[in-house]
């Protein structure tokens, strides 16, 4: 521990410091011959120099000032905004009749914020070999914390350290094995949004750090293949919802199956492109009650016993991205389609309900399309204008649910952006973010305007038809009828950011 502290302190003082890792001296012994029958002493003729372990301290000091014209779902006192909040004064529905709501919209309230919690500190290690591979490692943290506090309470973990990266990489000539915590498979280090806002393209761009085992291999001159298994160890970066087993972390652990992903990538000096997929298994519930006479689940009282159950939900999503780099521009495009994005600070989730006949729990995942693009002018090294555009669409459940198959009072939605309590769901979201980055040495200033428009509506399947009856199916798509109470929540955000890299 003392030695580690010495390394870290030396790195902070000198920024980059090299330490000698002591190893036993190896000798090549050669007999000098014999003189008068006496053997000459063995003389060492060569030594192997000690390996050098390099430790580099890096990071940046960052300060953000931001203004929002509307309240949002946000993180850490608004430093990271996700999407504009729905209206609180929607028209009042009575049967099939809508009447005006006289109240003000409580979410139509501006805010001005300041923060330095994105400041980052990291340590890179390397310079040694093992198992025939070059070994390197990274330990990275910031002051973003891991949870939000109640507004005005100071009860969150803002300003506290959180673990971002902690991994070891083993590099051979044509392959790499990485073990530890790093970016999720859909966050592409060589192709991610460079927004001034710390949201880094959330909720269009998947964002999270996950413990993983990742193996990459060159399969051609410009082609590589990556495969990995991973899991969750932080509720904020796990499937969102109110799980019977705890958090989304627990839901994956009880499934006893790791998430997995694979990508095929082409890359040369100017062009990068890849396609991939990811699978994830959850076990939202592990116990239930069962009637010993009827075999029906979910009962209470005499004749019902507790049973362990296996009710897994499997989700699948797909990825495609590309990046073009020239002397004048950098263009990026990234798209995902699938069913599992709340663990990436995204929207959507899954519906759960009890079968009306057997009482067993059933699950249906919601489908979603996410895409974003970014264009950066690189004509100048000092001033670089850019624009980010993101779009997402709620595609509804993979299979609609017949309302007759749902046991009364058991239908729920686990996720983000959809609520059975309010009967509301997101429809689509568009974000347009122009910015200008100013560079000078290790300093950067950025000014950005972010326009986010989220369309909300009542959930299709919960809206009465003209005769007052409810539809026979529910798919959690947004309603399209006039009485679906559509509302587009719009937020204008202006950000000013200062960064000093070291």
Question: Language-model segments: which ranges?
Answer:
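Outer-membrane beta-barrel proteins
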Residues: 68-72, 148-150, 188-192, 234-239, ...
């Amino acid at each position: 521990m003392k030695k580690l502290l010495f390394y870290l302190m030396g790195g902070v003082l000198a920024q980059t410091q090299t330490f000698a890792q002591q190893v036993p001296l190896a000798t090549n012994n050669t007999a000098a011959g014999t003189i008068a029958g006496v053997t000459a002493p063995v003389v060492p003729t060569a030594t192997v120099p000690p390996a050098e372990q390099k430790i580099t301290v890096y990071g940046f000091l960052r300060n953000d000032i931001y203004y929002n014209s509307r309240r949002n779902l946000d993180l850490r006192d608004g430093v990271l905004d996700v999407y504009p909040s729905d209206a609180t004064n929607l028209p009042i529905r009575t049967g099939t009749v809508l009447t005006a709501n006289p109240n003000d919209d409580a979410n139509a309230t501006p805010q001005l914020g300041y923060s330095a919690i994105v400041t980052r500190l990291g340590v890179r290690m390397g310079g040694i070999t093992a198992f025939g591979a070059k070994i390197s490692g990274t330990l990275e943290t910031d002051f973003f914390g891991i949870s939000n506090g109640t507004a005005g309470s100071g009860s969150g973990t803002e300003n506290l350290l959180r673990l971002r990266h902690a991994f070891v990489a083993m590099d051979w000539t044509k392959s790499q094995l990485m073990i530890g915590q790093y970016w999720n498979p859909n966050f592409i280090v060589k192709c991610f949004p460079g927004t001034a806002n710390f949201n880094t393209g959330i909720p269009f761009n998947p964002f999270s750090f996950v413990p993983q085992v990742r193996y990459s291999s060159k399969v051609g001159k410009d082609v590589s293949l990556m495969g990995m298994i991973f899991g969750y160890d932080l509720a904020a970066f796990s499937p969102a919802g109110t799980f019977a087993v705890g958090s989304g972390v627990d839901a994956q652990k009880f499934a006893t199956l790791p998430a997995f992903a694979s990508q095929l990538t082409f890359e040369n000096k100017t062009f990068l492109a890849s396609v991939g997929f990811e699978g994830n298994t959850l076990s939202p519930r592990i116990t239930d009650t069962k009637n010993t006479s009827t075999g029906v689940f979910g009962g209470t009282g005499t004749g019902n016993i507790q049973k362990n159950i296996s009710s897994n939900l499997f989700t699948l999503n797909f990825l495609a991205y590309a990046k073009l780099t020239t002397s004048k521009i950098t263009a990026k495009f990234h798209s995902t389609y699938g069913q599992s994005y709340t663990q990436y600070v995204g929207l959507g989730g899954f519906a759960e309900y009890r079968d009306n006949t057997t009482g067993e729990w059933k699950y249906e995942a919601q489908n979603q399309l996410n895409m974003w693009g970014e264009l950066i002018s690189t004509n100048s090294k000092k001033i670089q204008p850019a624009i980010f555009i993101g779009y997402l669409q709620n595609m509804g459940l993979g299979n609609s649910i017949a309302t007759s198959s749902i046991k009364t009072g058991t239908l729920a939605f686990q996720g983000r952006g959809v609520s059975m309590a309010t009967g509301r769901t997101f429809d689509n979201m568009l974000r347009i973010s122009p910015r200008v980055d100013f560079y000078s040495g290790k300093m950067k200033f950025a000014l950005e305007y972010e326009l986010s428009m989220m369309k909300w509506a009542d959930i299709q399947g919960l809206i009465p038809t003209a005769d007052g009856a409810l539809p026979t199916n529910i798919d959690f798509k947004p309603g399209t009828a006039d009485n679906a109470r559509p509302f587009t929540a719009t937020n204008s955000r202006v950000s000013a950011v200062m960064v000093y890299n070291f």
